[in-house]
């Protein structure tokens, strides 16, 4: 229905989850995320095609098979980019990216360019690439005010990242 209301402009993005603890509430481990993601993405495709959903009387109405051409996949890995490319989906890149062990200051483009290259190499002939990179914009009256507003959340996030085993260099908001 939303695609009808937007006159065919709906784009839909999916990702397997960003942190290992994201899966625990669903009774899954992080290691199971790839298979679970593939299964659920297949279910979405089936629903959009109008296939039955667990019972002959259960179908998505109205069916929306056109949405399969407007899927975006979020990934941190070249393997995920290859799967997205092979399926002809768009590639979503994050504003941040886990750094390889021992390289906490590796620039974002050094991590994401190989992901983009893998995606482009995997696209079927004739399929136009679709790549987006999310970025954060924080608007404030001054740099000092922006830091003051952001500091509590950034400190909390840094604490959570450290607890999850990530290396966070520095101890100030500007680090």
Please identify what each model-predicted range represents.
Residues 1-175:
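Active-site-adjacent structural elements that line small-molecule/cofactor binding pockets in enzymes
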């Amino acid at each position: 229905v939303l695609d009808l209301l937007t006159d065919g402009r709906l784009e839909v993005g999916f990702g397997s989850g960003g942190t290992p603890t994201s899966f625990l509430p669903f009774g899954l481990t992080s290691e199971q995320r790839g298979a679970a993601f593939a299964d659920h993405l297949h279910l979405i495709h089936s629903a959009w095609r109008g296939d039955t959903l667990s019972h002959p009387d259960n179908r998505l109405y109205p069916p929306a098979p056109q949405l399969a051409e407007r899927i975006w996949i979020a990934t941190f890995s070249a393997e995920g980019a290859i799967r997205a490319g092979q399926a002809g989906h768009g590639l979503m890149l994050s504003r941040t990216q886990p750094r390889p062990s021992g390289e906490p200051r590796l620039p974002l483009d050094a991590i994401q360019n190989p992901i983009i290259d893998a995606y482009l190499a995997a696209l079927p002939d004739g399929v136009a690439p679709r790549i987006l990179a999310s970025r954060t914009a924080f608007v404030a009256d001054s740099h000092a005010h922006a830091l003051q507003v952001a500091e509590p959340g950034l400190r909390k996030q840094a604490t959570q990242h450290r607890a999850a085993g990530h290396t966070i260099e520095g101890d100030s908001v500007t680090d």
